[in-house]
Amino acid sequence: MRSEKSLTLAAPGEVRGPEGEQQDAGDFPEAGGGGGCCSSERLVINISGLRFETQLRTLSLFPDTLLGDPGRRVRFFDPLRNEYFFDRNRPSFDAILYYYQSGGRLRRPVNVPLDIFLEEIRFYQLGDEALAAFREDEGCLPEGGEDEKPLPSQPFQRQVWLLFEYPESSGPARGIAIVSVLVILISIVIFCLETLPQFRVDGRGGNNGGVSRVSPVSRGSQEEEEDEDDSYTFHHGITPGEMGTGGSSSLSTLGGSFFTDPFFLVETLCIVWFTFELLVRFSACPSKPAFFRNIMNIIDLVAIFPYFITLGTELVQQQEQQPASGGGGQNGQQAMSLAILRVIRLVRVFRIFKLSRHSKGLQILGKTLQASMRELGLLIFFLFIGVILFSSAVYFAEADDDDSLFPSIPDAFWWAVVTMTTVGYGDMYPMTVGGKIVGSLCAIAGVLTIALPVPVIVSNFNYFYHRETEQEEQGQYTHVTCGQPAPDLRATDNGLGKPDFPEANRERRPSYLPTPHRAYAEKRMLTEV
């Protein structure tokens, strides 16, 4: 049975036992790193003035943590008070201590913000596994380099990478970002303007020596009906079917008109900038595989490849020789080529997503959708069930009506979708009493179906929005960890002696590092790989 010693404080820097003999702090079992201590021995932990008392065997359950490892926690030991002192967040320590008492259950107190509690977890060194489990319980995305910005090792590549990838890094980088945004906007405007009737290449009335443009003058209904035809008339009224007899002069004329078109020239300048930017960023990126895994870089590739496909198609059409016969086959081949080109050029609209590289709002929206994929999947699944159910119900409810607008269940899918989403397009509607009842139930079910997952999506958006705001605010402050003595404490073989404790001098107080202060730093921490 262990006999407890009654200790009395004497002069600063010395501790006396029951017989009055002088003892060093290294004579205490706990202060000496736990050597020879009983597993049921208790110790006191002082968190910013709030004292906690627990057993050593409770902390020893996790020996790889700050409190569980005697060698790590010993530098916070105060021999004058015979306790450990931490100048940390007090409400968070309730959950930290419960982590040891419960054998690994980590729960954040409701009155502690998430970022503060994450900082406390890292300070007490609970480990990456506990941190990952806690983030998963909190609904956070796993950490994996999202806030860590890798940089190339070469100085020149590092400067180029910062210049084109991080607009906030310098003034020239902001200038390049502004130029990139302007080029993106010009490309989108050109994509929209070239579809106007005043500028659209129509190919009718080709008496001007090439492909004519649509006149802005109003035309009669008969000519408007003819405009809906997909046939094209080229140089001097030559139709696509007559190209075989007309030689390649019409194609040359078309090619010359295509390559001298103002829209094509502006588009070419935009593509030159996009290609230059992509190649520079690829040559300076720190990791080539990670470069192609980035969704933004994939969008950049998708934004420029339709131009080169269209350009290659036009060049091939100019160089190939048309046969003297088989005009019908050429007509069908050209119609197929035009259809493919329309689909390819439609991909140009995805250039608008390039703006998300320079917009925090679009990035937050993308992260919200990524984090809400499960809720969005449930929403689509519920809508699918509702569409099948109510389209079948309205079809059979309207089956006896001769004027029914629902000839089949697949035809009623459209009505069910616009009704459940509360759009109410109005092109299809029930006429019978039973059909109207089904329509009412469909609208109510649609409101409930859409309303259920929306709060989760809004919650994710708020989380990412506040996290982005907090990161911007944290970029303006530098946090200095408090509670660690400034000089390095070195443990002796027999424990901790008086020379190892600066608090055992006449000042009676440890020399702590300064409190958190404001530092006007705008940049985030960038790690070099």
Curated annotation (Swiss-Prot):
Keywords: Cell membrane, Ion channel, Ion transport, Lipoprotein, Membrane, Palmitate, Phosphoprotein, Potassium, Potassium channel, Potassium transport, Transmembrane, Transmembrane helix, Transport, Voltage-gated channel. InterPro entries: BTB/POZ_dom, Ion_trans_dom, K_chnl_volt-dep_Kv, K_chnl_volt-dep_Kv1, KCNA6, KCNA6_BTB_POZ, SKP1/BTB/POZ_sf, T1-type_BTB. Residues 1-33, 210-233, 488-513 are annotated as: Disordered. Residues 500-510 have a biased composition (Basic and acidic residues). Pfam families: BTB_2 (PF02214), Ion_trans (PF00520). Residues 1-171, 285-295, 359-373, 466-529 are cytoplasmic. Changing V456L: Found in a patient with epilepsy and neurodevelopmental anomalies; uncertain significance; affects channel properties resulting in slower channel deactivation. Residues 210-220 have a biased composition (Low complexity). It catalyses: K(+)(in) = K(+)(out). Residues 194-262, 317-337, 396-409, 430-436 are extracellular. A motif (PDZ-binding) lies at residues 527-529. A motif (Selectivity filter) lies at residues 422-427. One of its GO terms (molecular function) is voltage-gated potassium channel activity. One of its GO terms (cellular component) is cytosol. Residues 360-373 are annotated as: S4-S5 linker. It is found in: Cell membrane. GO terms for biological process: action potential; potassium ion transmembrane transport; potassium ion transport; protein homooligomerization. A lipid is attached at C285 (S-palmitoyl cysteine). The chain crosses the membrane at residues 172-193, 263-284, 296-316, 338-358, 374-395, 437-465. Voltage-gated potassium channel that mediates transmembrane potassium transport in excitable membranes. Forms tetrameric potassium-selective channels through which potassium ions pass in accordance with their electrochemical gradient. The channel alternates between opened and closed conformations in response to the voltage difference across the membrane. Homotetramer and heterotetramer of potassium channel proteins. Interacts with KCNAB1 and KCNAB2. PANTHER family: POTASSIUM VOLTAGE-GATED CHANNEL SUBFAMILY A MEMBER 6, VOLTAGE-GATED POTASSIUM CHANNEL. Belongs to the potassium channel family. A (Shaker) (TC 1.A.1.2) subfamily. Kv1.6/KCNA6 sub-subfamily. The N-terminus may be important in determining the rate of inactivation of the channel while the tail may play a role in modulation of channel activity and/or targeting of the channel to specific subcellular compartments. The transmembrane segment S4 functions as a voltage-sensor and is characterized by a series of positively charged amino acids at every third position. Channel opening and closing is effected by a conformation change that affects the position and orientation of the voltage-sensor paddle formed by S3 and S4 within the membrane. A transmembrane electric field that is positive inside would push the positively charged S4 segment outwards, thereby opening the pore, while a field that is negative inside would pull the S4 segment inwards and close the pore. This is Potassium voltage-gated channel subfamily A member 6. The gene is KCNA6.
